[in-house]
């Protein structure tokens, strides 16, 4: 067997594996023998069909399985032995020659590999990101006051029709509620904006290049039957932005030796469950009910993965906020909403 590596650039490799008959012959023989033991052909006792008949019916299948087994082992070994940090899985190359599945042949397989980029940057106090304090504009406050008045009018009208108690609100009460709601709303939005700006800042600072053509092909193969090339093109920029942040986040987790433990996952799952119940108006549920739901969430690996990513985000953001300069910046709510 011969394995040769062709470096296209820092992010792309072409791997050629030449499998000779001697590499797969013994594996093929064992697979044919196994088929023979289990074969049940009319006119022959089980396991007693002649080898020629077994080869006629199962020969190509056993050949393909044997070659693929050898090929897979060689591919995995080369990646491990050469410490290749590959993205996703190797893809059959567009330069792959046609394979003629004939017993005794030598076979050539060509693979494209996408490689993770090297990431290296420092986090210093000279890294500056604006931290917004939002002043609510008169226009936004007037809109909120108008919406609240309509809300209470409709609520009291419904209460009157049902002979229920009304909730009387003075103009002063509504003005106060509007101010409180807007303050809370823009505080949350400013916190979200700060995290977004920090994320974008360090993704740009890292200057990460990716094997984009490979990634498009890999996404199509990995999601075969679920997405089209057009779907991938449409969402590709968003995918790249998220992927780059994942790489930056992973680099910073390692740089600062940040870890996620079971307690982190449990607390995050509990917060997630509590929020989900609150969305349906179910607050102040018994602790036992919350914990039962948490246990179920943590049994779902996809949920655990999402929760772990959120915990990583939180840990990395907290650390970055300590290490960089957050520049206090006052802004009106109208201008804040216009930020890109």
In which residue ranges do the predicted regions lie?
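Extended, charged alpha-helical "arm"/coiled-coil substrate-binding scaffolds
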Residues: 2-67, 129-340
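Non-catalytic surface loops within mature trypsin-like serine protease
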Residues: 19-21, 113-117
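Generic hydrophobic, aliphatic-rich segments that mediate packing or membrane embedding
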Residues: 50, 54, 67, 71-75, ...
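Active-site helix/loop of acyl-thioester processing domains in fatty-acid/polyketide metabolism
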Residues: 59-83
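Extended, domain-scale alpha-helical bundle/helix-rich regions
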Residues: 78-115
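Beta-strand/loop-dominated core regions that host nucleotide or nucleotide-derived cofactor-binding catalytic loops
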Residues: 126
């Amino acid at each position: 067997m011969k394995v040769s590596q062709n470096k296209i650039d820092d992010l792309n490799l072409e791997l050629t594996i030449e499998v000779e008959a001697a590499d797969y012959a013994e594996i093929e023989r064992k697979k044919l023998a196994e088929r023979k033991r289990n074969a049940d052909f009319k006119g022959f006792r089980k396991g007693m069909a002649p080898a020629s008949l077994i080869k006629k019916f199962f020969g190509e299948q056993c050949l393909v399985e044997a070659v693929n087994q050898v090929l897979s082992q060689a591919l995995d070994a080369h990646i491990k032995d050469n410490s290749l940090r590959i993205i996703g899985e190797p893809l059959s190359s567009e330069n792959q020659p046609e394979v003629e599945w004939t017993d005794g042949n030598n076979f050539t397989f060509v693979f494209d590999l996408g490689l993770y980029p090297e990431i290296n940057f420092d986090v210093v106090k000279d890294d500056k990101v604006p931290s917004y304090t939002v002043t609510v504009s008169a226009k936004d406050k007037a809109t909120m006051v108008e919406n609240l008045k309509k809300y209470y009018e409709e609520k009291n009208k419904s209460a009157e029709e049902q002979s229920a108690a009304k909730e009387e609100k003075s103009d002063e009460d509504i003005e106060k509620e509007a101010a409180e709601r807007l303050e809370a709303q823009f505080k949350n939005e400013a916190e979200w904006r700060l995290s977004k700006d920090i994320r974008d800042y360090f993704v740009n600072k890292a200057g990460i290049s990716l094997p984009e053509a490979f990634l498009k092909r890999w996404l199509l193969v990995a999601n075969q039957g679920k997405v089209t090339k057009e779907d991938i093109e449409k969402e590709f920029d968003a995918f790249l932005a998220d992927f780059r942040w994942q790489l930056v986040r992973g680099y910073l987790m390692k740089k600062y030796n940040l870890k996620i433990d079971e307690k982190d996952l449990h607390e995050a799952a509990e917060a997630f469950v509590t929020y989900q119940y609150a969305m349906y108006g179910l607050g102040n549920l018994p602790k036992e009910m919350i914990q039962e739901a948490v246990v179920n969430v943590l049994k779902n690996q996809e949920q655990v993965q999402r929760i772990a990513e959120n915990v990583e985000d939180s840990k990395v953001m907290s650390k970055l906020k300590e290490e960089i300069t957050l520049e206090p910046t006052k802004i009106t709510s109208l201008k804040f909403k216009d930020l890109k």
